[in-house]
Amino acid sequence: TTAFHDYFGEGDRCALDTTYRFNQRIGEVANRFIQQNPAQMSKPLNSLTAGEKNAVTLLSDDQLDALLDKLSGYATPDDRILILARYHHLKPATLAKAATRWPKLNLDFMTVHASKGQQADYVIVLGLQDGQEGFPAPERESVMEQALLPQPEAFPDAEERRLLYVAMTRARKRVWLLFNKAQPSRFVEVLKRLDVPVARKP
C-alpha cells in the first residue's frame, strides 16, 4: 500500500524486484496496466525470461474451444492450464467434456480471487465483457454493499485492475484474455493501447 506510514508508522521498504514465475512480456503488460493508477505503488519487476510479443493476447470468447484444440497439440501433460473467470458461475459448459475431448490437457478452472498464490504454464481469462456480470464488475449500488465494503478509490476500477493483474501474472508462458465482441469490457481498449495484440484465431 502507498499509505503504509499513515496506518503503521515509519518503516523500511525492501523491493523484491525479480520474479521467477512470469516472463518479462507478461510482467510489462501487467505492470503498465496496473500502474496507470497513480495511487498504485510503482514496483517494476525483472524476469529471467523475455517472453514473446504475443505472450499476452486478446481473443474473442467464441474461440475457447479452438484455443483448447490448439493447446492440445503442443502443451505437455505436465503443463498446467488455468482457466479463470470473475465469477464461478461463468465456468464454460464446454469444460464438462474436457476430459474426453482434450484428454492430454491438464486443465483447472477457478475464480480469479481463488487463483491468488497459484501458478500455471498457460492462463485463459474469461469474461472480459461489459454489463452486470462483467469484468470489471459494475459499481456497487446497494446500501448494504456501500456500508460493508471499503470506500471505492478515486481511480476508476482500481480494485478490478488489481484483480486482472492477479489473473495475468498467474501464467509462466502465455495468457489469453477472452472478450465478448458484442459487449467488450472497457479493459479491452486499455489493453489494446498497451500494444496487446488481438488475434482472430488462437
PLM features per residue range, with description:
Residues D6-F8, T49-G51, R101-W102, S115-Q118, ...:
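Conserved catalytic network of the ASCE P-loop NTPase/AAA+ motor domain
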Residues R13-A15, V56-L58, F109:
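Conserved beta-strand scaffold positions in the cores of enzyme catalytic domains, especially
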Residues T18-F22, A85-K91, Q183:
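Acidic, metal-coordinating catalytic cores used for nucleic-acid/nucleotide bond scission
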Residues T1-K53, A199:
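Conserved RecA-like helicase ATPase core segment
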Residues T1-F4, K91-W102, R186-D195:
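Short, aromatic/basic amphipathic alpha-helical patches
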Residues P77, L105-N106, S115-K181, R186-V190, ...:
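Conserved helicase C-terminal RecA-like lobe
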Residues D62-Q129:
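Conserved helicase/translocase motor-coupling segment
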Residues A55-A66, R200:
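Short acidic-hydrophobic, aromatic-tinged amphipathic segments that line or gate anion-handling sites
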